[in-house]
Amino acid sequence: MGSRLPRDGGKQGHGAFLDGQLLVAMPGMSDNRFSRSVIYLCAHSEEGAMGIILNRPARKVTFSELLVQLDVIKADEMIRLPAQAELVQVLKGGPVETGRGFVLHSNDFFIDDSTLPIDAGVSLTATIDILRAIAKGDGPDRAILALGYAGWSAGQLEAEMQDNGWLNIPADPSLIFDEALGSKYERALQKIGIDPGRLSSDLGHA
């Protein structure tokens, strides 16, 4: 998967693009990095696509530890973080730019020239300012932090979908922010009436 980010957020020709939807990996997914993955598609255009994997935890670091590593707070301030910050999950967002952080969050938070509203319930901010806001209790009501992202070059995602690598379904903020990581895959499929146990790699798109 490539590292090129679409510049326009996928807003050209709305009908052809899937930004704001979920991609669910099909059983025949040949790339183990994306097996049983659920991806929120942040941008999709003629130039390519960019998304965040929603169900892969970053096991070696917590949000509070990351704040210390980035000098947002001092180590002795971890115990005084607001409850909002303690709820932020840290995910492995994908194999591209794994040292870079991306915050998916509710639309009640916005930073000029930094926040990209994606749909009615989700925005993306990738600057340290949002981490500072969360640490102070001034951040969005709901948020997840992803390290890295999944990227596709021009036409690559479309080709993978034609090969039944992915199923696309409508996104739901409750699934993105609230659902337990271990159940997101099954929950995403159940939302469109698919029994995960009977899912075939020959199934077409939603």
UniProtKB/Swiss-Prot annotation:
SUPFAM superfamilies on file: VC0467-like (SSF143456)
A GO-annotated cellular component: cytosol
Domain of life: Bacteria
Transmembrane parts of this sequence: none
Alphabetical list of InterPro entries matching this protein: AlgH-like
Signal sequence interval, chain numbering: none
Similarity comment: family membership: Belongs to the UPF0301 (AlgH) family.
Protein name: UPF0301 protein Msil_1255
Species of provenance: Methylocella silvestris (strain DSM 15510 / CIP 108128 / LMG 27833 / NCIMB 13906 / BL2)
